[in-house]
């Protein structure tokens, strides 16, 4: 492999390609003369679109093939949406860089309604996320919620075809693809607490590849990396996956980190919420502490029920 070239493994979806191109542009900006090549791959999560992610193995399905590509020497790094990255990294891989977070919020998208509360009785809502389903059903138990898979363009097309009254997507994905005008309302964390890592991109590479780690290091955004340490530590304590409705969102409040988290049942009937504040230097400890508090207050039982 030439020292002046990097190959980025990426999924083929428009959003994944945008994210990889964004990282490629940043790498070229920091390293003039560096050749950056995209290596598109199809993952199992992209191929199986007729089932909910929670039924076929979770978000790790979107990254395993990319990791295999790095192991086999076909790529040097991979770019991921951090909300898709499991809390436990596989042996032999590192996550050295987290780029500056875009917006972390969920977006309510509808052609006829401005907000969730405006949907008619028994309205049809589409989402691919148990976390979003849980919080929407808690607010509107009457809604019919169905699994909505596929890339952003596919999901919008299903809404436009009348299959749903509204859908909920990540605001960052819509914005990155130029679909800001489709957002009826950005949902504040108080209404729809984001997924762990939502809105941030991460770079994964082989743990032993010092060359790649040095080249990507300038792209790391320390403040975002610290916040995600808190969120991911909470998720690690909960041993969360996308089979479980878990949300976690950290932000800065003065000189402290404010971390909010929740664990719920898919039907929204049970939700355990919690929050902690503490020193920035203790980000991981704060996340671990909040995870423990949620477990003690009922999350352990919810998680056990979902595992059965």
From Swiss-Prot:
It comes from Alkalilimnicola ehrlichii (strain ATCC BAA-1101 / DSM 17681 / MLHE-1). The gene is hemC. Tetrapolymerization of the monopyrrole PBG into the hydroxymethylbilane pre-uroporphyrinogen in several discrete steps. GO terms for molecular function: hydroxymethylbilane synthase activity. PROSITE patterns: PORPHOBILINOGEN_DEAM. It is an enzyme of class 2 (transferase). Monomer. Its cofactor is dipyrromethane. Binds 1 dipyrromethane group covalently. Keywords: Porphyrin biosynthesis, Transferase. The porphobilinogen subunits are added to the dipyrromethane group. This is Porphobilinogen deaminase. The keyword Transferase applies. Its EC number is 2.5.1.61. It catalyses: 4 porphobilinogen + H2O = hydroxymethylbilane + 4 NH4(+).
